[in-house]
Amino acid sequence: MKLTIQKLGYVRNEYARGLKTHRSITIGVLIPELSNTFSTLIVSEMEDELRRHGYGILVCDCRSDPEIEKTSLRFLESKMVDGVIVMPISTDGKVFDLLPQDLPAVAIDRFTLSDRVSHVLINNREISARATRMLTDHGHRRIALISGSEGMFTADERRKGYEEALQIAGCYDASLICQGDFTVDGGYVAMKRILQAENGVTAVFVTNYEMTVGAIIAINELGCKIPEDYSFIGFDNHELSKVITPKIATVNQPLREIGREAATLLLEQLDGKAKRNIILNAALEAGSSVRKVE
């Protein structure tokens, strides 16, 4: 029989199979910004893991727009997906109220108030505190932060880690926090504001990859040098270490592991297992971008 199937080039009709099993063999994935490097790497790894278990994915990019997010979730439901993996814009968990109660769901990079989903997170607050301590340990006291938008879970957690470390060191100054909205342009504008403020800043901590790129563009454009003029810690290495001198100290998230774990948590729910949360550890990689100051 197998030989006959191979000779005929038979391909199983998954739609017909789905009608029998009441499964579409498809997982819906909803991302706020697919152009974001963070999202792209996670989705790629997630797809590989789900494919190994016979599932395809249907990806929606909601462009950080809550209305598009709602429309996209309704679209995924209409396609009868077997589960959803979402990077929610909001942390209130209300977005999941749009879905059937029994639909397996996983939230990435956000801790929501919903008890009906599993979560995959990193130790945002702890790793940001460690990065900030690296700067204070090198004698820095005027440390600027380029943060994401207020109210976004990851941005808030990373800011809190920075604040806690500086409060312990006795040098916290809220005026040194600049919002960069997790985009290259946002990082660029925030860094230019810091450089032009002349407020004694000697070090900068940037809390995502796109803003890190934007901040470095601004530093180069204004003729400043790292670490001679400003010590610098960025977020996520990706290709930075290959193209930038000196090597930038960075907080590196386990992006591929995040994707794998998100897929695993969803597969567990599809198998009838209980929801659970996973917190992964990011790493702080030293570079040559932090100097000692007296």
Give the ranges of each region predicted by the language model.
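Active-site-adjacent beta->alpha loops and helix N-cap segments on the catalytic face
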Residues: T91-P100
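Redox-cofactor binding/interface segments in oxidoreductases and associated redox assembly factors
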Residues: V29, V86, V206
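Residue-level recognition of strand-loop junctions within catalytic nucleotide-signaling folds
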Residues: P32-E33, I89, G148, S289
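Short beta-strand and adjacent tight-turn residues that come in two discontinuous sequence segments
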Residues: V81, V86-M87, L145
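Short beta->alpha connector loops
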Residues: R63-P66, M87-D92, E210
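Amphipathic helical "hinge" segments at domain boundaries
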Residues: L8-F75, K79-G83, K160-E163
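Bacterial carbohydrate/catabolite-sensing allosteric modules
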Residues: Q6-K7, E45-G56, T71, E77, ...
